[in-house]
């Protein structure tokens, strides 16, 4: 009989622990955030369709390449605290490769996005332009047709 009580107690503990983990995994609440816009550094351009940027204004974490595939530089500007950079285009730069390659680089308006529902690697700013947070959610993978 004591074995049954121990098993029941252990099962009860596992259920209670599982409920706490489940509640924690539910994640984001449903209320809307008060975010003005978001920036998600993305890969842009190609050897045949170059971008207009320079190393100073390029995003940290992104690499910038020539039309021949030579690395020109790594981006120097932090989206959370951008550098004051000249607006000229470095004609040696044709394209960028960033850790995130899909989706929009600028999210405006943000709709009901919150810090919790915002995508990891994206930076969100208030309506006053001040940095608020980095997104916390994984971005859904784009649907790929197998046909």
Swiss-Prot record:
Q: Which residues does the UniProt site feature Reactive bond for trypsin point to?
A: 30-31
Q: What induces it?
A: Not induced by wounding.
Q: Which Pfam families match?
A: Prot_inhib_II
Keyword Signal recorded: yes
Q: Secretion signal: which residues?
A: 1-25
Q: Which InterPro entries match?
A: Prot_inh_I20, Protease_inhibitor_I20
Task: Report disulfide bridges, numbered on this chain.
Answer: 28-116, 32-112, 40-122, 52-89, 55-73, 56-85, 62-98, 115-133
Q: What PANTHER family does the annotation carry?
A: SERINE-TYPE ENDOPEPTIDASE INHIBITOR (PTHR33832), WOUND-INDUCED PROTEINASE INHIBITOR 2 (PTHR33832:SF20)
What function does this protein fulfil?
Answer: Inhibitor of trypsin and chymotrypsin.
Designated name of the protein: Proteinase inhibitor type-2 T
Q: Which organism is it from?
A: Solanum tuberosum
């Amino acid at each position: 009989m004591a074995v049954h009580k121990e098993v029941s107690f252990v099962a009860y503990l596992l259920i209670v622990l599982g409920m706490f983990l489940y509640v924690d995994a539910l994640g984001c609440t449903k209320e809307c955030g008060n975010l003005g816009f978001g920036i998600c550094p993305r890969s842009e351009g190609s050897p045949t369709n170059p971008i207009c940027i320079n190393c100073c204004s390029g995003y940290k974490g992104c690499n910038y390449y020539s039309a021949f595939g030579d690395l020109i530089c790594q981006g120097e500007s932090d989206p959370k605290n951008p550098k004051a950079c000249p607006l000229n285009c470095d004609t040696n730069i044709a394209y960028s490769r960033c850790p995130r390659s899909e989706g929009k680089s600028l999210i405006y308006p943000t709709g009901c996005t919150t810090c919790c529902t915002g995508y990891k690697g994206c930076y969100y700013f208030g309506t006053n332009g001040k940095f608020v947070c980095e997104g916390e959610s994984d971005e859904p993978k784009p649907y790929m047709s197998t046909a």
